Amino acid sequence: MSLTANGKANLATSPKTSISSEPIIIRRATLKDAPEMGRVGGRVYYDTPLTSWLWPHRAKYHAQYERHWIERRLALMLNPRNESYVACSSSGQIIGAAQFARLGDDAGAWKRIREIGVLRRVFMWVAAWVFWGYCKVRWWLEGGDKTQNKEAVETFASWCRVDGERYWGSHEERASRWHCQSLVLLPEWQGKGIGKKLMAVVMEKAQRDGVIIGLEASAKGEGLYTKLGFELLGRFTGEAGAVEDVGQGGMMIWYPEGYKKEASSEM
């Protein structure tokens, strides 16, 4: 799959080779990839204003900080609506990762869930609960999380709930969608077209399903998504935007070819 100038899916042509001289492999992630996916995410966001606010003690308790990222990656992978992908160098090193969720109660969403199979869904359900319990017990044994500013985490979670309802929950027409939960790429590999290749995976799926893609863009990531044809629905809540980068970053949406857009983009 390749993308046209306006970011629409062009399924008739193959993607161009990355400008990097080293071949990059995009493949479906496995549960064994979760630790390295988490470490990549933790490294990418380590010095951002938001991370500094949420995890001010991450340097002193780096192992706990890293575990947050690993646990989140694995928890998402144990949801049957999730699809996770990694970008690997020719040596097999994971240099980037993306996680997407197929949301909604439409026929396409349920078809995908059924295709996973009953046994696998049961395994994922049991594994998710076991993993949740394991994480709770481990944090308790360690005396709780020492990396976080708990008040900041609770405040940020409340902002996320407000924005989630404002841009997604209150819009029935946006319920059926692919949602980009995470896209991370090691700094030394950025600017080489790898992020575009990872996003092409979900854009092809959304084009095939005839549904939109939604995501929360960081200040730095907004440029990439704009180039891919995403449109800005609105900035994060004022406080969240200020923490991120002077009001930059926000909720973005992508429409597949032939999709009838909403009559109004009002938030």
Where are these regions (language model features)?
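A short beta-loop-alpha structural element at the N-terminal edge
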Residues: 25-39
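Active-site rim helix/loop that mediates acceptor-substrate recognition in acyltransferases
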Residues: 56-84, 89, 163-169
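Conserved acetyl-CoA-binding loop-helix of GNAT-fold acetyltransferases
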Residues: 185, 191-204
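Conserved catalytic-core motifs of GNAT/GCN5-like acyltransferases
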Residues: 231-251
